[in-house]
């Protein structure tokens, strides 16, 4: 995965673009954002669980856009994860 290209593409449509990473099996409790969140997985994997019951699995190269107010939780895969994200314009 070309991380620099993915970040450049995200910067064209979002602001406050930043990267983050987590270790294997880390968990994010259910929460929501007041903005549209655009996220690209650049390494590893993560599973997002949406409040409506859907599950979205992301691996390197996959992208997810969460509209404002979308309640979600997440569980990192067995190899950890690294993502870049931003607030979509």
Q: What residues fall within each predicted segment?
A:
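Conserved short histidine dyad/triad with adjacent acidic residue
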Residues: 16-33, 68
């Amino acid at each position: 995965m070309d991380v620099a290209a993915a970040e450049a593409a995200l910067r064209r449509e979002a602001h406050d673009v930043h990267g983050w990473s987590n270790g294997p099996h880390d968990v994010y409790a259910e929460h929501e954002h007041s903005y549209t969140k655009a996220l690209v997985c650049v390494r590893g994997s993560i599973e997002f669980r949406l409040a409506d019951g859907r599950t979205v699995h992301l691996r390197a190269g996959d992208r997810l856009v969460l509209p404002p107010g979308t309640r979600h939780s997440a569980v990192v895969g067995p190899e950890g994860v690294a993502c870049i994200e931003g607030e979509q314009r």
